[in-house]
């Protein structure tokens, strides 16, 4: 069962996910990658280019090259690295721009810490895969930028966003669906993730300290100890706002926290975090449905449930429950992982063009209104799902 799953992951990665971006998204005219393909498979060559998409392409192809050693993946990763450094990196103030126009000129120059985290994730993975010193140098620079400008030495944690020059910004939101709060679970999760990866290749004392601190923030501030769900939005003093449960973030955080503790290699910390990992994954399973998929979120104030099945939530569900099987021998979790993979194959994979669709709606209809590739729709969640199950 486990071996069949791995064979299917290799096939998914190498035939449906990775070729799609190599064949359709490389912008030969203006450099880097196109900004968008619609859910109807229409390329938008003049769409804006997002830092997150570029950084996630960099991570995905670097990791695929590290795992499989194929030269075309290295070329794709190198293209993403070059474009990130030459166009997204702000050589005057540090950090990365949020977006560029299709020609590669800065558009939204704000410093969204989440995006800088992904740049570190991609660059550190490229260094891990190739030994490239330039990628590590820029990853370390960006780490220093986050620590210098975003870290709150007084109240702890990291602020959400700043202006290009690292000053206060009125609208800190990562996206339109987010609350305008200073500290968020999502940004902390996606600082934990690149810091973990950077620590694999750069054993710096401050980085180590901040990685320990981030794990502590999750267990002490972000985790709701009563429900074992993650709280999503906080004011500067860590007071939780807007009680919403995000099942996909719960299951994603469960394995990323576990990974961070393992990479630090501290047996005491691992022993401390393992019960937390299991509790968060158990809480996330409230979002699983009888057909194997995982729904999006629940508003605890109104009781409203968003029952759509987003592509990224399904990918993280496969990884998160497989993690419980891999490290704790949990057969029930393996079944959750397999069931969700079967759900993905039934409902989300595009057998005609490749890649996955954005979501299956709660009413059972396929969502083709949202992007097939774009600012938020990247090869990272589903690519990483395959890479995680094939690795170790």
UniProtKB/Swiss-Prot annotation:
A Pfam short name: GlcNAc_2-epim
Dependence of activity on temperature: Optimum temperature is 45 degrees Celsius.
EC number: 5.1.3.11
Keyword Transcription regulation attributed: no
A GO molecular-function annotation: cellobiose epimerase activity
pH dependence (record): Optimum pH is 7.5.
Gene3D superfamilies registered for this protein in UniProt: 1.50.10.10
Catalytic activity: D-cellobiose = beta-D-glucosyl-(1->4)-D-mannopyranose
Entries under SUPFAM superfamilies matching the protein: Six-hairpin glycosidases
Cystine bridges: none
Keywords: Isomerase
Record's keyword annotation contains Isomerase: yes
Family indicated by similarity: Belongs to the cellobiose 2-epimerase family.
Protein name in the entry: Cellobiose 2-epimerase
Lineage: Bacteria, Pseudomonadati, Bacteroidota, Bacteroidia, Bacteroidales
């Amino acid at each position: 069962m486990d071996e069949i799953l791995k064979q299917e992951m290799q096939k998914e990665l190498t035939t449906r996910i990775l070729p799609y971006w190599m064949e359709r998204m490389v912008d030969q005219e203006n450099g880097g990658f196109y900004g968008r393909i619609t859910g109807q498979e229409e390329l938008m060559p003049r769409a804006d280019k997002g830092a997150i998409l570029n950084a996630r392409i960099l991570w995905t192809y670097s990791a695929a090259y590290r795992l499989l050693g194929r030269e075309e993946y290295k070329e794709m990763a190198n293209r993403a690295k070059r474009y990130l450094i030459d166009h997204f990196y702000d050589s005057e103030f540090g950090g990365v721009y949020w977006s560029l126009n299709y020609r590669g000129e800065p558009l939204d120059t704000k410093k969204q810490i989440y995006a800088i985290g992904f740049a570190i994730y991609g660059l550190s993975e490229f260094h891990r895969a190739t030994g490239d010193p330039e990628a590590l140098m820029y990853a370390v620079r960006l780490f220093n930028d986050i620590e210098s400008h975003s870290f709150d030495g007084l109240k702890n944690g990291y602020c959400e966003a700043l202006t290009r020059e690292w000053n206060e910004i009125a609208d800190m939101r990562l996206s339109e669906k987010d609350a305008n709060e200073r500290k968020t679970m999502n940004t902390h999760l996606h600082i934990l993730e690149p810091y973990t990866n950077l620590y694999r290749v750069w054993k710096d004392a401050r980085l180590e300290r901040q990685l320990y601190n981030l794990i502590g923030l999750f267990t002490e501030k972000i985790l709701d100890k009563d429900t074992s769900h993650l709280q999503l939005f906080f004011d500067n003093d860590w007071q939780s706002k807007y009680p919403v449960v995000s099942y996909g973030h719960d299951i994603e955080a469960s394995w990323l926290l576990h990974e961070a503790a393992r990479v630090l290699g501290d047996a005491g910390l691992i022993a401390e975090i393992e019960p937390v990992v299991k509790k968060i994954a158990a809480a996330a399973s409230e979002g699983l449905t009888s057909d194997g998929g995982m729904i999006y979120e629940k508003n605890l104030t109104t009781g409203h449930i968003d029952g759509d099945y987003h592509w990224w939530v399904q990918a993280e569900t496969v990884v998160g429950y497989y993690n419980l099987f891999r490290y704790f021998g949990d057969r029930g979790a393996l079944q959750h992982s397999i069931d969700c993979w079967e759900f993905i194959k039934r409902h989300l994979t595009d057998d005609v063009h490749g890649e996955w669709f954005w979501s299956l709606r709660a009413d059972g209809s396929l969502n083709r209104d949202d992007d097939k590739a774009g600012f938020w729709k990247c090869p990272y969640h589903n690519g990483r799902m395959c890479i995680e199950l094939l690795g170790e």
